Design a protein with these regions (language model features):
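C-terminal motif of bacterial Sec signal peptides marking the signal peptidase cleavage site
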Residues: 12-13
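Flexible, processing/modification-adjacent segments and terminal tails
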Residues: 49-53, 124-191, 214-218, 271-284
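Generic structural signal for well-ordered beta-strand positions
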Residues: 90, 134-136, 205, 237
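Gly/Pro-enriched, hydrophobic low-complexity segments
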Residues: 178-271
């Protein structure tokens, strides 16, 4: 049984200045004279562009709640999700309960009885039913891991703090029909992510990236839209989420409630624990 993957980005942080290796080298007085000369050859306009991108990312963090946002360790949410194939709905939607503990634990429960779940811990995934845990098919697991690898929390927690990641401010753009500031991040593997920040509030309203299918070698584009932001426990939270695959709507999710830092029961992330969501949870 296959259920839609529900990836929502609700945490990222920013530490040291992530303007790329070039600027970091320029500011490091212990560098060799050759490295300094190389850095000084970079046009000032490029460094200014990277600084602009960095400053906008800082504004995005503040717009999402600042320190309250950075301090999120876990969260749970519930709502209704819809899946699509070639842009056409495949069902009337279903209820979901989602639990995330950073950096790599996630549980998604579906059906009104919450007796079917998908569980991801590290690089492994299981489907949980009354028959017990079963490993998720490799294709579906790889899809989930790709979404996590390019998720906002990964990009804006890990990439932004990686001195080898280059930042580019691409100027004004449209995210759907909304004006936005566009930023591109490129990591050391030459993987790129485009972020679109609301031009007024600075919250991220769109993310896109490309990847090549290892089987047919076709280039694919995935986009995520975030909307209907509400402040919850000091965290500016998107209650609306939509994913597009090569221009076609793939998943749409509407959140009804969110809670942060609830100290989730660790048993829910153990596929063999027999965890029952309908019994009172044990905090840890």
């Amino acid at each position: 049984m296959k259920y839609p993957l529900l990836i929502l980005t609700l945490i990222f942080c920013c530490g040291r200045d992530p303007l790329g290796t070039a600027e970091a080298t320029h500011q490091n007085s212990s560098q060799s004279s050759a490295s300094k000369a190389s850095t000084q050859s970079i046009p000032a306009v490029d460094l200014q562009n990277a600084r602009k991108a960095h400053d906008l990312l800082e504004q995005a963090i503040q717009a999402l709640g600042g320190q309250a946002y950075l301090n999120v360790h876990d969260f749970d949410e519930q709502g209704r999700t819809y899946s699509f194939h070639h842009g056409q709905p495949t069902s009337n939607g279903m209820l979901f309960w989602r639990f995330v503990e950073y950096p790599d634990k996630e549980r998604i429960e579906v059906t009104p009885e919450r007796d079917v779940a998908e569980l991801y811990v590290g690089n492994k995934g299981w489907e949980l039913t009354y028959k017990g845990p079963h490993l998720i098919e490799a294709k579906d697991l790889n899809e989930y891991l790709r979404h996590r690898r390019f998720s906002l929390e990964t990009v804006l927690h890990d990439w932004v703090n990686d001195a080898s990641v280059a930042l580019f401010y691409d100027g004004n753009a449209l995210a759907g029909n909304l004006p936005a500031d566009e930023i591109t991040l490129i990591n050391s593997k030459d993987e790129a992510v485009d972020l679109f920040l609301d031009i007024d509030s600075h919250v991220p309203i769109k993310k896109s990236y490309k990847w090549r299918d290892p089987v047919d070698r076709q280039l694919n584009i995935e986009e995520e839209i975030y909307d209907n932001f509400r402040m919850v426990q000091g965290v500016n939270t998107p209650y609306g989420f939509t994913r597009y695959f090569n221009g076609d709507m793939q998943t749409e999710r509407f959140v009804n409630a969110v809670h942060y830092n609830e100290q989730l029961d660790e048993a829910m992330f153990d596929p063999n624990s027999g965890y029952n969501p309908n019994k009172p949870q044990k905090k840890h």
